[in-house]
């Protein structure tokens, strides 16, 4: 939710428009202040997160590895809840690699270099939720521009094509490992969701049979691409949690 809203506000800001937020509850306002979203867009200072569950909102240059590394290290891997989710070094390296591959895709394919990130820890559920997005050329638009055979395909099908092994819009022989590699890394123990232009695509975790759900949204194209993943180390608990948990809006 936070990253999607951030995508919209960045577009409004680039257009030179004035924006304000009205009608949000006090709890939501505090949550969006703790994760640095409201201070980033409206100014002011952040609130202290006494439980340290929040992965703060980040908006930066996808090409700036040092800043992105610092953000991930401080907000994700040095968080005291990281070991509540997983103490597996391979899991940490896998997530870090996947996030950096996503950022690389932003700079290579979307024609913009700005990447937005935010997340939330749910330590009692052994769960991490993280979202990343850009406001550049969408995945479907990028594919139809470079692969003209797909001009009339639904956007969700185009996203699915982009996640398959060996598919790419780049000419290099070594390309085509981007979203497939990311999907393989992130769905071993969690779900992966991609929304781009009119397409919605989600792959459940391999533990939950790895089923793919995809459909097209009606008359609500999203400029750019939004990607969310969850790392669920205790699926028996998380599967019994109501999906309408209000905390889930905060990332």
Where would I find each of the regions flagged by the language model?
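Helix-loop-beta hinge of the Bergerat
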Residues: 55-86, 140, 147-166
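A glycine-rich helix N-cap at a beta->alpha junction
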Residues: 38-56
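Amphipathic alpha-helical interaction surfaces in cytosolic regulatory modules
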Residues: 1-41
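Conserved ATP-binding N-box helix of the HATPase_c
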Residues: 6-8, 89-124, 183-185
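ATP-lid-like helix-loop hinge signature
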Residues: 103-146, 214
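Flexible, glycine-/charge-rich segments associated with ATP-binding catalytic modules
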Residues: 42, 149-151, 164-251
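Conserved helix-loop functional segments at active or binding sites
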Residues: 78, 82, 104, 108, ...
